[in-house]
Amino acid sequence: MASNKVVFSVLLLVVLSVLAAAMATMADHHQVYSPGEQCRPGISYPTYSLPQCRTLVRRQCVGRGAASAADEQVWQDCCRQLAAVDDGWCRCGALDHMLSGIYRELGATEAGHPMAEVFPGCRRGDLERAAASLPAFCNVDIPNGPGGVCYWLGYPRTPRTGH
């Protein structure tokens, strides 16, 4: 009888140890693989975020002619700015914040129909697709989107929350 209690106690300790280790691993996983409270403008990326990417996205949206050396420099600068956002989880947030800034600059609302023009020759959906695809083009990691495309691209009619 006493040996059964010892075996049961040992098994209970083993199970509790395994559960404690699993909980610690899950907590570490959540901390590493999810956006934190620090993913905000002025904290994880500048308040006026990604100025070269703003230029690039607007040029892409209107389908400006042949690429020039200046355009290549804008691409490189944009990719450097996007890579400089230290936390991969925050990159889509920085792009979303950038789009919000573009809309404010143009006097457009943040939410709207994807086919609506935000400026001559540029529809909202095209502008958002150009921004959402930058991580893939720049080959920077974003852990929250398939194929390097920001998750909010899949929901063009859903207003973005902004940051």
UniProtKB/Swiss-Prot annotation:
Keywords: Allergen, Disulfide bond, Secreted, Seed storage protein, Signal, Storage protein. Seed storage protein. Pfam families: Tryp_alpha_amyl (PF00234). Five disulfide bonds are present. Residues 1-27 form the signal peptide. Disulfide bonds join C39-C90, C53-C78, C61-C122, C79-C138, C92-C150. The keyword Secreted applies. GO terms for molecular function: IgE binding; nutrient reservoir activity; serine-type endopeptidase inhibitor activity. It is found in: Secreted. SMART domains: AAI. The keyword Protein biosynthesis does not apply. This is Seed allergenic protein RAG1.
